[in-house]
Design a protein with these regions (language model features):
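Glycine-centered hinge/linker elements that transmit conformational signals in sensory
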Residues: 184-188, 222-254, 294-299, 408
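Short, solvent-exposed loop/beta-turn-alpha elements that line the ligand-binding surface or hinge
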Residues: 119-130, 173-175, 218-236, 242, ...
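Short, polar/charged alpha-helical segment
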Residues: 43-65
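Hinge/lid segment of periplasmic solute-binding proteins
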Residues: 100-155, 184, 287, 291-300
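Extracytoplasmic/periplasmic solute-binding protein
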Residues: 141-149, 154-156, 181-226, 233-234, ...
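Conserved C-terminal helix/tail region of periplasmic/extracytoplasmic solute-binding proteins
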Residues: 383-453
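Extracytoplasmic/periplasmic substrate-recognition and gating elements
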Residues: 248, 285-359
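Extracytoplasmic "Venus flytrap"/periplasmic binding protein-like
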Residues: 62-130, 166-167, 266-267, 284-288
Length: 453
């Protein structure tokens, strides 16, 4: 009997201890927690995610003793570098934040063992609310390390105000921008119409090549290497190179939105999230300004019967803390941010797509929930692409980030050099068509050489 009582008492004590431990590991006003975050959404002074974080801090965060502190709003590449410096213990490196937004490539930088497994906190029911493909692609060896919070795709942006004047003079139309063949022909005509101004900027040549080769049934990447020797690559390189060498495409570094502002370009391909930075007016060299209408169109196609586009979007990572309070706080914040109402408010303020199925259905059922009217054409373009296009996620492989960056820089470098040679040789009296054809070939040879180094 005494033994039985002892066992019962021991069980009660253990249960009480477990209960106390569980309570102490949950955030609350009596157990306040501060989480630091680095993210990429906007800027320090103009950020849709900062607005969402402020709302969280003043509501659910306050109720649970949680404060999310935004330490840095910067680019994904800057976050990659800062995380690498922190993970490697480099002198002067900032401490790794409790939360950060990034692309899947950071897992190899930070290390899986240092990241929180969201599966340990979200229930199966909670995860089932996410769009299936968004959640299924973010597992790493069956471990959910990256939680999707916003997704983007790509679109074609156009300064319609200036384009309309160009159209009236030349007969080109917006319908010509449905395909890359039409886009490139339009770009060359614009270069002539303006006596030497670029028509557009391509914000990601890696995406252009990936979708272009997919459209022809080929693969841009195989065994972690770019397939620049594939004959299909020449199909997509030739019209791009011809237009860039002629002068229709801006090949300088920097953001397209900045060049829109000064009318250096009037169009670009880029993320749907770029709408956050599109200017409402432009300024001319004589310092006069003009209000403009900007629109977004579906991503141009390569072939008539195959439509494809990249969809992407980083996710929310959490550092796996020894302090369980921080892990629980990270879950509470992540759950709040991905709930339908809060996620819709955040993403539609930034040109992104929500990550839950019910939120996506709500968005495309009624665009009026998007407060900024200038964003409506972005979501209309996305709606068309959801209906007609195949969406592709970029492949993950070791060194993918570096390969993508190198390809981007190499493409711009070889085409810029070729453009300068074209202008010089044509001005010296050489036949433009002969020079152009030669430079298309030599630029590809140089690109292959740089890519193999």
């Amino acid at each position: 009997m005494k033994r039985t009582v002892a066992i019962i008492m021991t069980s009660v004590i253990l249960l009480m201890c477990f209960s106390c431990c569980t309570q102490s590991e949950m955030p609350g006003p009596e157990n306040p927690v501060t989480l630091t975050i680095w993210h990429v959404y906007g800027s320090q002074t103009k950020s849709p995610l900062n607005i969402a974080i402020n709302e969280f801090n003043s509501t659910v965060g306050k109720e649970n003793g949680i404060t999310v502190n935004v330490v840095s709003v910067t680019s994904s590449s800057a976050i990659d570098k800062a995380l690498a410096a922190s993970a490697n213990g480099e002198p002067g490196a900032e401490a790794m934040p409790d939360l950060f937004t990034a692309y899947p490539r950071v897992v190899e930088i930070v290390g899986k063992e240092n990241l929180l497994n969201w599966d340990d906190y979200f229930t199966e029911k909670e995860l089932s609310a996410f769009q299936t493909e968004f959640i299924s692609e973010v597992y790493f060896d069956n471990v959910l390390l990256m939680l999707p919070i916003a997704k983007s795709t790509e679109a074609f942006y156009l300064n319609k105000t200036i384009f309309d004047r160009f159209s009236n003079d030349t007969g080109v139309s917006i319908d010509d921008l449905n395909t890359f063949a039409g886009v490139f022909e339009t770009a060359r005509k614009y270069y002539d119409w303006t006596d030497g101004q670029n028509f557009m900027q391509i914000n990601d040549y890696y995406h252009y090549a990936y979708i272009g080769m997919k459209s022809y049934g080929a693969e841009f990447v195989r065994n972690s290497r770019l397939r620049l020797d594939d004959e299909v690559f020449m199909k997509i390189w030739k019209p791009l190179a011809e237009t860039a060498i002629y002068g229709g495409i801006c090949l300088d570094d920097g953001y397209a939105a900045s060049r829109w502002k000064t009318v250096e370009v009037i169009a670009n391909t880029g993320s749907t999230a770029d709408v956050l930075y599109q200017p409402a007016e432009v300024i001319y060299p004589d310092n006069t300004t003009e209000d403009i209408t900007a629109i977004a169109l579906p991503y141009p196609t390569f072939v008539d019967d195959t439509f494809g586009v990249i969809y992407r979007g980083g996710g929310l990572f959490a550092r796996n803390s020894e302090d369980e309070l921080k892990n629980q706080a990270a879950y509470i914040f992540a759950k709040w941010l991905t709930e339908k109402e809060h996620n819709l408010d955040f993403v539609t303020d930034a040109g992104y797509l929500p990550v839950r199925t019910d939120a996506i259905e709500t968005l495309f059922a009624d665009f009026s929930i998007v407060e900024k009217e200038s964003y409506h054409s972005v979501y209309q373009a996305v709606e068309t692409m959801i209906s007609d296009y195949t969406f592709y996620a970029l492949p993950l492989y070791e060194g993918a980030s570096e390969t993508q960056l190198d390809f981007e820089q190499n493409v711009k470098a070889v085409l810029k050099t070729a453009h300068n040679q074209y202008i010089k040789r044509v001005n010296q009296g050489e036949d433009p068509e002969t020079v152009l054809n030669e430079l298309v070939e030599t630029s590809l040879t140089e690109l292959k050489k740089l890519s193999s180094e």
